[in-house]
From Swiss-Prot:
InterPro entries: PLipase_A2, PLipase_A2_Asp_AS, PLipase_A2_dom, PLipase_A2_dom_sf, PLipase_A2_His_AS
Major subcellular location class: secreted
Organism: Pseudonaja textilis (Eastern brown snake)
Entry's family note: Belongs to the phospholipase A2 family. Group I subfamily. D49 sub-subfamily.
Signal peptide range: 1-19
Alphabetized Gene3D superfamilies for the sequence: Phospholipase A2 domain
Name this protein carries in UniProt: Acidic phospholipase A2 homolog textilotoxin D chain
Phylogenetic classification of the source organism: Eukaryota, Metazoa, Chordata, Craniata, Vertebrata
Length: 152
């Protein structure tokens, strides 16, 4: 084997070892992102909704900056209610760890009946938010705003 091939192989192995220690995002975040992509294909990366306005992403306060942000406020409230369901084994702030199943067919989202009550509630929260996002324009000016100034 050529020395150059050995160096490439060594580099790949080191990269894989490093990647193994990187924490994975929760599955629910990925499911929610896929739902958004189902309702808004090719328009806006779902990652743009992770830090938008006062309510999309971590932290929630103040008055929503626009209709997209209102979708996120409603989504936060929906997650809180889902976390209160008897038999739902998550705390409201851990609801992102709930796995659920759904189908996307030509922009239409359906939460599968195989979901338990908690999974169905979280799935429907994500479904409603994805549909809500599709109804309103995404304003790049509200991405990654200073929430301490704009969200009082």
């Amino acid at each position: 084997m050529h020395p150059a091939h050995l160096l490439v192989l060594l580099g790949v192995c080191v990269s894989l070892l490093g990647a193994a220690s990187i924490p994975r995002p929760s599955l629910n975040i990925m499911l929610f992102g896929n739902m958004i992509q189902c309702t808004i294909p090719c328009e806006q990366s779902w990652l743009g909704y992770l830090d938008y306005g006062c309510y999309c992403g971590s932290g929630s306060s103040g008055i929503p900056v626009d209709d997209v942000d209102k979708c996120c406020k409603t989504h936060d409230e929906c997650y809180y209610k889902a976390g209160q369901i008897p038999g739902c084994s998550v705390q409201p702030n851990e609801v992102f760890n709930v796995d659920y199943s759904y189908e996307c067919n030509e922009g239409q989202l359906t939460c599968n009946e195989s979901n338990n009550e908690c999974e169905m509630a979280v799935c429907n929260c994500d479904r409603a938010a994805a549909i809500c996002f599709a109804r309103f324009p995404y304003n790049k000016n509200y991405w990654s705003i200073n929430t301490e100034i704009h969200c009082r």
